[in-house]
């Protein structure tokens, strides 16, 4: 339970999310959660190569021309599956659990449902400033500061 107290940190800041598990090396896109920190990893949100992989065929702007703010916006839109410009609990869940395996890395054990719920609750509690149950882009961007 004490480790769940650490999940109250700001949404995208631990960062994004610290991706270190003792004895294992893995990277999760969209989440710096390795069972102890919460938020989206800033390095993931700003990872041009990863974002461009997901946006291949969607946008034609060269990645070298994208500002950090444009990368943030594209990252947000990548996880806004219903296109309502808000991230709900389910969209946050998929962002948190979106795992990218690196060659030669060990697989991180899956997060329990209770851990995932606690993280999402913490994100909404800390970053949903208007208490509407969603993270809008302004709240998302502020959580990355």
From Swiss-Prot:
Record keyword Endoplasmic reticulum present: yes
CDD domains: EFh (cd00051)
Subunit description: Interacts in a calcium-dependent manner with LMAN1.
Transmembrane regions listed in the UniProt entry: none
Name the record gives this protein: Multiple coagulation factor deficiency protein 2 homolog
InterPro entries noted in UniProt: EF-hand-dom_pair, EF_Hand_1_Ca_BS, EF_hand_dom, ER-Golgi_Adhesion_Reg
UniProt binding sites for Ca(2+) 1: 80, 82, 84, 91
An individual GO BP term: carboxylic acid metabolic process
Record's subcellular location: Endoplasmic reticulum-Golgi intermediate compartment; Endoplasmic reticulum; Golgi apparatus
Gene Ontology molecular-function annotations: calcium ion binding
Domain EF-hand: 67-102, 115-145
Stated role: The MCFD2-LMAN1 complex forms a specific cargo receptor for the ER-to-Golgi transport of selected proteins.
GO cellular component, one term: extracellular region
Keywords, alphabetical: Calcium, Endoplasmic reticulum, ER-Golgi transport, Golgi apparatus, Metal-binding, Phosphoprotein, Protein transport, Repeat, Signal, Transport
PROSITE patterns: EF_HAND_1 (PS00018), EF_HAND_2 (PS50222)
Residue sites binding Ca(2+) 2 per the record: 128, 130, 132, 134, 139
Gene3D superfamilies to which the protein is assigned, alphabetical: EF-hand
Principal location class: endoplasmic reticulum
Signal sequence, renumbered to the chain: 1-26
Record PTM Phosphoserine, positions in chain: 105
